[in-house]
Amino acid sequence: MILRENITGLLHEWSEGDDAALERLTPLVYDELRRLAASYLKTERADHTLQATALVHEAYLDVREMRQYSWQNRAHFVGVMANLMRRILVDYARRHNAEKRSGDNVKVPLSQAELSVSVKPNVDLVELDQVLERFSVEHPRRAKIVELKFFGGLTIDEIAEVFSQDTDKITTATIERDWRFARAWLHSEMTSV
């Protein structure tokens, strides 16, 4: 527990203006973030040029702009970093698709089994991002759960920990129900396209 308390303390120090706190935090979460980035990149095409280390570093460049964010704990930070990495990959995919201009892209539907803890092969990240944007308008809490679980790789208990700091505290049972609902909704949306 000391490690988690240290991470939470460093996040609070950083949000209060201590830029060196982020530097001290980095080695404590870097391996976890790198593993997460590597799992994302396993789903990318063979000629993908972005490496896991570069993806983590790009996300760190973005998170530096969020210093005054109300950081809650390690799970919250990892979830935000996962979201940043997702956005980087979506932007990368959009640029790649724009460069192709060949129109021969094959859409591969997302099966319900594929919507699990981490990004799976054959998921069209641009399409998934668009569907998640629509979902978040109608179901913001459930969309946050999807981001934390699907992209952040957090467990139900870790997601509850993130929400425990919010005004919108929810139980693990509610998170599980919301996760089942979100999976079904996203599956329906992505297979109907």
Q: What kind of feature is each model-predicted range?
A:
Residues 1-31, 35, 64:
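N-terminal module of bacterial RNA polymerase sigma factors
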Residues 12-16, 39-46, 58-76:
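Sigma70-family region 2
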Residues 30, 34, 53-61, 74-95:
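Σ70-family region 2.3-2.4 aromatic/basic alpha-helix that recognizes the −10 promoter
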Residues 33, 115-144:
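Amphipathic alpha-helical segment used for protein-protein interaction
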Residues 39-42, 86-104:
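Arg/Lys-rich amphipathic alpha helix in sigma70-family domain 2
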Residues 136-158:
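Short amphipathic alpha helix immediately N-terminal
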Residues 152-174:
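Helix-turn-helix DNA-binding module
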Residues 180-193:
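Short, Lys/Arg-enriched C-terminal cap helix and immediately downstream tail that follows
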